[in-house]
Amino acid sequence: MANSLFQKHIISIPELNRSELELIVETAGILKAEPNPELLKNKVVASCFFEPSTRTRLSFETAVQRLGGTVIGFDNGGNTSLAKKGETLADSVQVISSYVDAFVMRHPQEGAARLASEFSNGVPIINGGDGANQHPTQTLLDLFSIFETQGRLDNLNVAFVGDLKYGRTVHSLTQALSKFNNINFFFVAPEILAMPDYICEELDEAGINYSLHASMEEVIPELDVLYMTRVQKERFDESEYAHMKAAYILTADMLAEARDNMKILHPLPRIDEITVDVDKTKHAYYFQQAENGVYAREALLALVLNEQL
């Protein structure tokens, strides 16, 4: 099948339309069920992480190898000769892109992936995270996990809990789900970490339902998806953090009234916002979600590097 993602830069979720998101999710399901080690044969993919990463880097590199491709790159850009010699990002991208067929990049600077796309000589840039801005491939694996567990991406009740102000994963997933029909959002956070105004304004303009809550227990019975995030300790003094943390810890007892189909997602790492007794419940899906990062990234790479599948 032909696809509009061929040779496309993957910089942010708003630049992907519904049909493209559905194509990635569908392809991820196919590749999870039927691995294809020929899709990236003779392809070289750069995996360039200018700040440390575990899940994103390893799942991308696993995806490339499972599809028959070759990976080059680095995991800590600050220790590379290009950083120590003061080479600009633009120059680094121009050089590295001349070696490869696709360029996966994480960078602490917001907007770095878009800048890279201007200097890559047409080689597709895939944003593995640029500061607090965007993390589109996390959103793709989140969508795949939701579809896998719910059988749909329309008609969902979805709650986001914790740090909704600084969490790039919740911003991107909200924007992605907004492209589907009849989505109801529940934003559960302390006022100081509430969903940014620009996200709420986008939802208002699109006529999408959302509500604000201080407690997750009041919304759990209504949910199909509960998306947990950690409250970041560095945002508070010790006493404030202790109070905030206690208000947003999910325990197994709190799931007594949850729908049978409700699944709990988390971008990881988990600190203490989900207690370990939740792991054995039928609702926990965050470790399977992390595994799905391989299949979602396989799908994306296959579509970006193959005009037809």
Swiss-Prot record:
GO molecular function, one term: amino acid binding
GO CC terms, sorted: cytosol
Top-rank taxon, per record: Bacteria
Catalytic activity as recorded in UniProt: carbamoyl phosphate + L-aspartate = N-carbamoyl-L-aspartate + phosphate + H(+)
Enzyme class: transferase
Pathway membership, UniProt: Pyrimidine metabolism; UMP biosynthesis via de novo pathway; (S)-dihydroorotate from bicarbonate: step 2/3
Subunit structure: Heterododecamer (2C3:3R2) of six catalytic PyrB chains organized as two trimers (C3), and six regulatory PyrI chains organized as three dimers (R2).
Stated family: Belongs to the aspartate/ornithine carbamoyltransferase superfamily. ATCase family.
Protein name (database record): Aspartate carbamoyltransferase catalytic subunit
